[in-house]
């Protein structure tokens, strides 16, 4: 069941804070994956992700929420340190990393401001909502920019991504600790349905076998959740009466 080549992992947030964090993580990964802007396709993916990230960052107190979570994780680790047999050096190392991330995040300029003030991103953002609105005749500035020497383009992009490093580093360690807080455990759904108590968790992680081709429809919040398994082929696919899968409530 744990064979990664024959299974697929799904994650589902159980609160709005986690929903925002997962979206930010996805967008930051997109920016990193398409940082080599050597063609229009990579460039548009990069700038669309940058535009989406600006929108996400403007919707809430991202810095405040992350700082609170960094502190919460430090407190949890302190409790672990008092348990006999725990690797105290590892716990101390993680706590120091959390403190370091918090200090950097606290002193960083307004998160996302560099993206928002970037002229090229601003110009491209105005055209993203228009179907086909990023043609060279619509965006001659982008067309010229893409024909600049790669060193010049890279310097521009590296500066933008460096401004996001405090956010990226804090988010990464937080999500890593949350994901590692609970192991995947074997479960069985009956007639395509499973439900349980969430116990104040932030995140559901679910690993399914690739065959049969199913996907989970998840609803829930911090106290309770329900999962319904549906066939990818809604007309001809079937859902087993008993389905084995793995689940973690983090």
Curated annotation (Swiss-Prot):
Q: What InterPro entries does the annotation carry?
A: ZapD, ZapD_C, ZapD_sf
Q: Which gene encodes it?
A: zapD
What species is given as this protein's source?
Yersinia pseudotuberculosis serotype O:1b (strain IP 31758)
Subunit: Interacts with FtsZ.
This chain's protein is named Cell division protein ZapD
In terms of HAMAP family, this protein maps to: ZapD
Record's keyword annotation contains Zinc: no
Compartments where found? Cytoplasm
What role is this protein assigned? Cell division factor that enhances FtsZ-ring assembly. Directly interacts with FtsZ and promotes bundling of FtsZ protofilaments, with a reduction in FtsZ GTPase activity.
Q: What phylogenetic lineage does the species belong to?
A: Bacteria, Pseudomonadati, Pseudomonadota, Gammaproteobacteria, Enterobacterales
Asked if the record carries the keyword Transport, the reply is no
Keywords from UniProt, A to Z, are: Cell cycle, Cell division, Cytoplasm, Septation
């Amino acid at each position: 069941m744990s064979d990664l080549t024959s299974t697929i992992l799904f994650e589902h947030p159980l609160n709005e804070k986690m929903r925002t964090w997962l979206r930010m993580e996805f967008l930051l990964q997109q920016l990193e994956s398409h940082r080599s802007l050597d063609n229009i396709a990579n460039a548009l993916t990069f700038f669309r992700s940058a535009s989406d990230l600006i929108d996400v960052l403007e919707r809430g107190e991202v810095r405040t929420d992350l700082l609170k979570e960094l502190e919460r994780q430090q407190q949890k680790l302190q409790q672990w340190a008092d348990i006999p047999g725990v690797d105290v050096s590892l716990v101390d190392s993680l706590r120091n990393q959390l403190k370091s991330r918090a200090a950097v995040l606290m002193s960083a300029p307004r998160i996302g401001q560099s993206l928002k003030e970037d002229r090229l991103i601003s110009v491209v953002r105005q055209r993203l909502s228009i179907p086909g609105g990023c043609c060279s005749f619509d965006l001659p500035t982008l067309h010229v920019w893409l024909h600049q020497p790669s060193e010049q383009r890279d310097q521009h992009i590296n500066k933008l991504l460096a401004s996001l490093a405090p956010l990226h580093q804090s988010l990464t360690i937080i999500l890593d600790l949350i994901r590692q807080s609970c192991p995947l455990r074997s479960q069985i759904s009956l007639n395509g349905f499973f439900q349980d108590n969430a116990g104040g968790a932030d995140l559901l992680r679910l690993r399914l076998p690739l065959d049969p081709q199913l996907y989970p429809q998840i609803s829930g919040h911090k106290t309770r959740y329900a999962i319904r398994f549906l066939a990818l082929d809604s007309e001809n696919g079937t859902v087993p009466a008993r389905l084995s899968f793995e689940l973690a409530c983090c």
